[in-house]
Amino acid sequence: MKVYHSSDTAQVGTILINDYKKNIELVRPFVIALKQNKECFFNLCLSGQYMRAVLGKFNMKNMDTYSVKWATEGLFEYVRQNEFPGLPNRIESNYFFDSIESSKRLFEEDWGEADQEERDKIRLFEAELRDDNPALFDMNWFDEAFEVIYELESLDQIDTSIEYARNYFGGKQSENYRFEIVSNKEAVIVNDITEKLK
């Protein structure tokens, strides 16, 4: 199946490796915290808010939202493990789009405000995904959960984020849905089409 993938490290011929950065280690503590209880998860997120404030104060560019990203991924993984175990783990999968237009939209959302040097690092590829039945999810639910965790002030907000994760894995469409293809199967980069981002 032909799909589209953005990367700053891949090149034509690359076989994409699931979780090549080993980010699962950053997610696991949040999953463990939720297995204990919501209060434990809340406290871990609060520690992350403190680190975000420290990193922001010392101008450590692009570092201040990392703990929110991993907390959100941990919450989604907890929901997946407990309610949707047959679906792929987000962290141990690769992400794709079914069209160049969707890839361009994500590029603008993620790197639209970055300086040109950062934007130039991102390449757009056509890939051959060897998965007959990849998962298709509305990425807006993840973004909504991220925003809730970013502003986390109460345990009720954790329940809201859990509901967003259920919507994501349950295949529910948001009003302005944006689908991503998530697969833990082999994919090979076949063509660099970065010029189509412009």
Segments and roles (model prediction):
Residues K2, D8-N62, R90-E92, E101-A114, ...:
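Conserved NAD+-utilizing ADP-ribose enzyme module
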